Amino acid sequence: MIPQLIVGLGNPEPKYDQTRHNIGFAAVDALARAWNISLAENRKFQGQYGEGTAPGGVKIRLLKPLTYMNRSGQAIQAVTSWYKLSGESVLVIYDDLDLPLGKTRLRLSGSAGGHNGMKSAIAHLSTQNFPRLRIGIGKPKNAVNGDNSETVSHVLGKFSATETQLMSLVLQFVVECVELSLKQGVEKAMNRCNSCTVEAPKS
């Protein structure tokens, strides 16, 4: 399956810019820059939306839902309904606490794994069978099992200067993985995306 709509999950207010939870937004911004696609607010689609041509001549649509994370599925459904896209043609990019920094995971299907944005996407697409690319944001250093406040402040916190350098390399790698999935299909891209660890630049 070749994705036709790529969605990055995040929260819309400026205070959430550059936070770990908004790495999905940052990924779509990186794709838009790489492919020269301009994103603009689209009320019908409840998000920032743009379309253009990705490498290989593939027509692609990009979306950043502006509904807040736990209602992301509304915006995704608005686009898929309008363009009559199947759920399987949607690639969703989002943050994952359980993956360390520098790791990414591309899968063809699966559960939400506790991620509210993905819960909403699954509910509105009425299927778990759509590809997703998870970007590792790591766990909080002082996490205690069951301490939700530590997790929330970590997820909604910003990357350190060193982490920001690493994440810019991760986003370059994400662009590479997505381009591979558009040219050769998600299955082929999974081997590359899931086997590599992006290393921090040597100081």
From Swiss-Prot:
Molecular function GO labels: peptidyl-tRNA hydrolase activity; tRNA binding
The enzyme's E.C. designation: 3.1.1.29
Identification of the protein by name: Peptidyl-tRNA hydrolase
EC top class, as a word: hydrolase
Principal location listed in the UniProt entry: cytoplasm
Reaction equations catalysed: an N-acyl-L-alpha-aminoacyl-tRNA + H2O = an N-acyl-L-amino acid + a tRNA + H(+)
Marked site: Stabilizes the basic form of H active site to accept a proton: D95
Binding site for tRNA: Y16, Y68, N70, N116
Subunit annotation: Monomer.
Active-site residues from the entry: H21 (proton acceptor)
GO CC terms, sorted: cytoplasm
Reported function: Hydrolyzes ribosome-free peptidyl-tRNAs (with 1 or more amino acids incorporated), which drop off the ribosome during protein synthesis, or as a result of ribosome stalling.
Compartment(s): Cytoplasm
Family: Belongs to the PTH family.
Site (described: Discriminates between blocked and unblocked aminoacyl-tRNA): N11
Keyword set, alphabetical order: Cytoplasm, Hydrolase, RNA-binding, tRNA-binding
NCBIfam families assigned to the protein according to its UniProt record, in alphabetical order: pth
Gene Ontology BP term (one): protein quality control for misfolded or incompletely synthesized proteins
